[in-house]
């Protein structure tokens, strides 16, 4: 689990993906502090080097919102995000609803989410006030397992 001392690494990870299209707003240091207080943030490491992060917020006992997933470009395409999401879904096996938001053009992420049981629930225009639409995805694997 990440802590305030990990904020520089979290900022650096976000900057590392800035060369590619950014599908969500980048957080500043004070926003990372808030994120750490309201939810869980995990630093993904390989050989003690930060290579990504995953953050989520428990909205209620039955609802978790995955607020962020970043993998350093040097480690993308190696199954890092898949492995981390599978572990998270196992950890949250008793949660009835797990959802996340992604850009409709983020085909790699969308394919990953759908392969793990997420379905598109709705499309929201101008979701973060940036003029861009987002897709709200919900994990049906969790919903079906808790019926």
Where are these regions (language model features)?
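Conserved catalytic-core motifs of GNAT/GCN5-like acyltransferases
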Residues: 99-102, 114, 119-136
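Short glycine/proline-centered loop/turn elements that form peptide/ligand docking sites
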Residues: 81, 85, 105-109, 126-131
């Amino acid at each position: 689990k990440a802590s305030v001392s990990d904020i520089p690494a979290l900022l650096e990870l976000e900057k590392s993906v800035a060369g590619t299209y950014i599908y969500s707003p980048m957080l500043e240091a004070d926003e990372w502090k808030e994120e750490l207080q309201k939810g869980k943030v995990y630093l993904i490491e390989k050989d003690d080097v930060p290579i990504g992060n995953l953050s989520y917020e428990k909205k209620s006992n039955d609802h978790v919102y995955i607020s962020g997933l970043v993998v350093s470009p040097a480690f993308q395409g190696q199954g890092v995000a898949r492995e981390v999401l599978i572990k998270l879904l196992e950890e949250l096996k008793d949660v009835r609803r797990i959802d996340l938001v992604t850009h409709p053009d983020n085909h790699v992420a969308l394919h990953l989410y759908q392969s793990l049981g997420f379905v598109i629930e709705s499309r929201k225009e101008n979701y973060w006030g940036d003029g861009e639409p987002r897709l709200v995805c919900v994990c049906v694997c969790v919903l079906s397992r808790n019926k």
